[in-house]
Amino acid sequence: EPCSRMIDNIHEKLASDMLGAPLIVINRTSMYVYGHNEEGAEPQERKTQVFWNVLSDVATPEYLEDFSRHYIDTACSLAKDRPVYLVRPIPEMLAKVPTTIGKGLIMGQAHDVVISRADYQARNAFVWSIQDKAREQCGIKILDPLPYLCDANFCYGSKNEKPLYVDDNHLSEYGNRLLIPMFSEVFTQGAVAVSGVQKD
């Protein structure tokens, strides 16, 4: 119910403001489905966090099917009146990056915070699949941050011991800037779309 109310509010807002302007959707969808995965997360936080019709503490096949249907329906509904861009999941680090770097520097054992690409794919395969289905069903576009945050083997929470995150899953200002090339296409196309919007 809270999710439904939020989506209704978003629809109302979008219907009245900047009709036709591009919409970028970026959120921690894998956490909604599988719960928190960072160090120190409470047991309740490690359970599924967002529900539609199927209530479950774990991501059962029935839960995933229900989540998938509502996710795609919502995304396609938003795409009826504007270009919609879904951002692939931002890599989640397993610990707070600045804290980890700071402790390492104090102890003379500083090293970059990373997760493996394999762990990223295992965590986010379901979200990728439903984003792909939304693209197939209603022409939604997808933005991929991995070329800017990862290499072939690892996704980085820091580079040269400089944090890219303010915690374990939110990019810092420095980290955000790495994604400017990813967003450039959106804003170039968005400027064209907005210039054609008719206002009374």
What do the predicted segments below correspond to?
Residues 1-200:
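Extracellular glycan-modifying ectodomains
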